[in-house]
Amino acid sequence: MRMRRRNNLEPRMARCQQIMIPAPQEMAGRWRSLMPEARQVRVEVGCGKGKFTVETAQAEPDVLFIAIEKVREAMVLAMERAQEMGLKNVFFLDMDVAKLAACFAPGEVDLIYINFCDPWPRSKHAKRRLTFPSFLDQYAYALPLGGGIAFKTDNAPLFDWSLEQFAACGWQLKNVTHDLHKDGVIGVMTGYEEKFHALGTPICRCEACKTAETKVYTPQQEEA
């Protein structure tokens, strides 16, 4: 995501510091301390401007949401939305998703959302796709058996490629569709999703569940 740099970014970020976690690695194994009564802990990777994040958090106040975004110009908009809505169940991480496994204990997250990530269409950039096996292994590390990923995109080639990666890495695929909103809008839409849907672009979605056969990241991979 490319956004225009804003001169007032730092003071705006500072005003949102109560819902931003500055040292997420220190929270591994302790995320529920932010909301002990939480029914679930969910993570959104690449939350962008936060429409999906805040609307889902508002709809499910008994769930703790952790939103990750490395583009600060986008994340500040998401945080400001959360504060304006008075949400107490969503926190933000200013970081790259590639560091996810270092920030969560094994099995600490119940569900991970991947919404409209960059498709990186060129083959030489495949490793940057958020459904590349090295990312899937980290998600599996943070999820318990039966935990899952909800993946949405408007990019059919990326979706089909991702289905192959999920299957090859031992994930169980469920509720796979190449036209999610064919019979009417389902669930909370992202900002991008609303635009694509209005243009008649089919939205692809699937759920991938962690099984005993799912490949899982190990800390030794960092040392290799």
Give each language-model segment a name.
Residues V45, I68:
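Conserved beta-strand/loop positions that form the S-adenosyl-L-methionine
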Residues V71:
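Conserved SAM/SAH-binding beta-strand->alpha-helix loop
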Residues G48:
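Conserved glycine-rich SAM-binding loop
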Residues G146-T153:
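Conserved beta-strand signature within the Rossmann-like core of class I S-adenosyl-L-methionine
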Residues E164, C169-A224:
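Class I S-adenosyl-L-methionine
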Residues M1-V43, K51-Q58, M79-P106:
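S-adenosyl-L-methionine
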Residues T131-L145:
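A short glycine-rich, Lys/Arg-flanked "PGG" loop and its adjoining helix->strand segment in the class I
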